[in-house]
Amino acid sequence: MYGDPALPPDFVSLPYVNPDAPTGGRIVTAEVGSFDSLNPFVRKGSTPWQLRFFLGESFMGRSLDEPFSLYGVLAESVETGPDREWVEFTLREGAAFSDGSPVTIEDVMWSYETLGTVGHPRYLGFWTKVDSMEQTGERSVRFTFNVEDRELALLAGMRPILKKAQWDGVDFAETTTEIVPITSAPYMIDDFEPGRFVSLRRNPDYWGNDVPFRRGTNNIDEVRLEFFGDETAAFEAFKVGEVNSNREFNVARWESQYNFPAIQNGDVVLSVLPHQRPSGMTGFVMNTRRDQFSDWRVRDAMLHAFNFEFINEAMTGSQQPRITSYWSNSPLGMSDGPAEGRVRELLSPFAESLLPGAMDGYSLPMGDGTERNRAGTAMALEQMEAAGWTIQDGQMKNASGDPFTFEILLDQGASENQAIIDMYVESLARIGVTPTVTVADSAQFKERTDQYDFDMTYYRRGLSLSPGNEQYNYYGSEDADTPGGRNLMGIKSSAVDAMIGRLLTSESQDDFVAAVKALDRVLTTGRYVIPIYQWNISRLAHAKELKYPEYIPVFGDWPGWQPDVWWYEE
């Protein structure tokens, strides 16, 4: 994005792989929930989240050791215009799908147009910025853009290339499990049972084994995703060896329950892994499309009523630090105190529309650690009163006597979230609010969140050191009401849109950082999400035969790292 890539044109392999890793073995992970689709490229159905990374080979691949650098995979070469107004890719000779047929420019152009018109919403925004797509040679294609946006040349390199002939006569947007996608990537779906498991096998004839970006990766023969009804069942399966790799998010369980026989005798290894990526945002999001949460003062009251310090002690022994903003734990996070310098310049035109704290400084409410949280409760009552709500006969009501109530929607398998909400409900009772808690199965949960049919729900948004066009999907106004989008809170803010636009057109690293810091301020002071704790390290328990390189990239345990750079060795 800025400057030069870290690796030279003749690099041999990525710095965080073992180019001499052996091949073989299997990795089995536990997934909570279910699935009813194998097509990760459309909105319909519930798909194992990993499939879009396994099945979507693209022109370029992202290095996990650099925020904004891509290297060739399907692309033999890439060229851009002087102002990145166009980008041209040349397809590698010999690139092939898993059925042995060659990848062609016809496949490329069909994939881009199909994904951009009837694919998942994550693909639609890019396509609207493509002015033209033209074949410029037997193995080359050029994309010309209709807006100034430095990231578009990178995004163009990261779209999955699918086999056009497989989808002839098929409604691409409506497919679920009846078609198993043919891919040019290293793995292909070998077997599956809806709602139970998906097995992916390493393609022994994979065309790209000698491509530098792929060398030393995709070493494990079978990647198997096993599905369970809840976290307890998944953990029990790991304990008895049905699963051989487990990513643990519950620090209390990590410290108290990872002492079973397989760990004691050395058959299972515990790995604690650092990373340098932002915290992202995890917590409970409020839907501003609903009347209950359209007033920022009500959202602020909900934040004050959430007794984080008490909950964190109960859930993690206070060992997990709180998320303080969307890009906290990174150089892109908002600074303490008033907005200054370039950040203030960017926000000043929108000062009248920004919420308190955006310009002058803001930090999340902090409790005293006690269960009653008296100061937080008092502030919550004060903000509710400012918004027109008071306690009448022990219940929070408006001037017309209507009670303030809302629904909290949770996913069936998320026992940790249910425990947090149980404590939150007790805190809300102290301000006369009694929410309804609804636990839905995975399919219902996805359908309702896709349609924005919720008041408050669990929210997790991983963010990187290279934010770009995806921020429009997360927080932009234009598609805020498009079903299946990612703007769950329903943000429609000219300041947010402008900051995203600025980070996309920044021509220097300093300007880019200022734009992200400004965006972080607007989002955090918008009080859309009640943040919980962050995972500033990764905790993985795995069979001793599963190994990874000593050098951990900047992004750490992130899509593209496990199982990609791991190997199995007895």
Model-derived regions, located:
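N-terminal lobe/hinge region of extracytoplasmic solute-binding protein
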Residues: 1-82, 110-113, 182
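Ligand/substrate-recognition segments at binding pockets and active sites
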Residues: 11, 194, 247, 356-381, ...
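Detector for C-terminal structural segments
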Residues: 31-33, 47, 54, 193-198, ...
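Gly/Pro-rich hinge or "lid" segments in bacterial periplasmic/extracellular proteins
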Residues: 55-68, 113, 157-222, 229-233, ...
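Aromatic-rich, solvent-exposed beta-strand/loop patch
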Residues: 72-76, 98, 103, 144-163, ...
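Surface-exposed binding/hinge segments that line
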Residues: 90, 124-168, 184-193, 338-353
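Ligand-site clamp/hinge motif
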Residues: 92, 175, 208-258, 300, ...
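Extracellular/periplasmic solute-recognition and catalytic clefts
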Residues: 132-134, 190-201, 226-290, 297-301, ...
